[in-house]
Amino acid sequence: MLRAGMILTVQKMSFDFSKRVAVAARLLAVAGLAAVAGACGPAPPAPRAGPLRVLATTTIVADLARQIGGDRVAVECLMAAGIDPHSYKPTPRDADRLATADVVVANGLHLEGRLAELLERLGRRRPVVAVGEALPQDDLLSAGGDRHDPHVWFDPRLWARCGTELADALARIDPPGAEGYAARGRDYAARLTTLDAAVRDRLAGIPEERRVLVTAHAAFRYFGRAYGVEVVGVQGTSTESEAGLADINRLVELVVTRRIPAVFIETSVSDRSVAALREGAAARGHEVSLGGTLLSDSLGGPGSGAETLEAALRANAATIAAALGSSTP
């Protein structure tokens, strides 16, 4: 639960930034974000005539902020569509934008690893809401060690709970808008429940032996858990390191042995590893088709038809169902 006067802030344990302190410190100096000694937590911004200025880290989080905030917020997004948040490097301009926002909304759970220092320091000065951090650990998948898989938006039921947490946080920052935030949170949760059922129906016709989703990185594990699909990524849950030859060979063996018909690339991740996987399978006599492009760590850009999470998940489900031979239209 959020304490009175305290907004859900990015937890130190959720960011591994020790190797990037020098870069982050320079950015913090540019933005004037040095921590204040003895700071006891962020204070809500003073009442203002216009909407709250919300800066979201990713397109997916920005969509959530718009859905919950409605006309009481003006949302900007730090990362453009198609950007990989795992490897995104903050710039001095990012520090300026973070410093002038009324509220910063992040995913957390290590997704924005290279923004760690900025977000943690900023959280001592103003509200930083990390929606993924509010989920019970029992609902999170492990990413190795003490880390959790950050791609929680791929389970609509979990994302609905993130929406509720954001509504609660915004209500504490902007009490006059509390009723509206709560109402929009309930409406969004209902729509995500409908979406969950639609995705489930769309995937139901995929034969059991073909319910294997092979992608560039392991972003779809929550999706797999929710819909009974085995998920295999050439890379792990983060894209900060390239897939090695051993990773490629392991996946080639799996694809060939199980006669997997299709693999998928992602909009925000290089397709090099998937291309190498297909070449390796072909060398073993098994042709693997390219099933299509999935939206993973970013929504589609303007005019793509996938500018919201709801649209993106529907598009992904249609692409997966078609490539894996679903009998459901």
Q: Where do the PLM segments sit?
A:
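Short amphipathic alpha-helical "recognition" segments used for binding
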Residues: 15-16, 23, 30, 270
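Bacterial N-terminal signal peptides
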Residues: 25-38
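Short, intrinsically disordered or compositionally biased N-terminal tails of bacterial proteins
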Residues: 1-21
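Extracytoplasmic metal-acquisition and chelation regions
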Residues: 11, 15, 39-329
